[in-house]
């Protein structure tokens, strides 16, 4: 797959590099980094994943999605200047949103292929949702159910 194909829904600024780059996976866990991965650096309440950028670059990742400038992290990595020029860096306002959009693109926008039915009310929601699921399955449709009694996908109940 080509990174550019994953970027259609994403609002980003290309800091450096080439979005016509081969990609295989989008990650946010630096321990899963490697060639072909897009690392999305998110700032959390305890950890700022931007600090793991030298690690993901060492592991072979060459595509970074960041929320802020990463000059210090690039200086800290063990790549020579020529290799650093090969890194593609995308800046976004919200890394979590970027991760969601990149993941959706990676898997072919599965939500666009789903029909969602919501049931609200005071009484009868569980009965109604199970009836809808039964009718859909009788019509040959695949149906899942998420409710207060659990999650049902096909015959699997959690």
Residue ranges, per PLM feature:
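N-terminal leader/targeting and accessory segments in enzymes
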Residues: 1-101
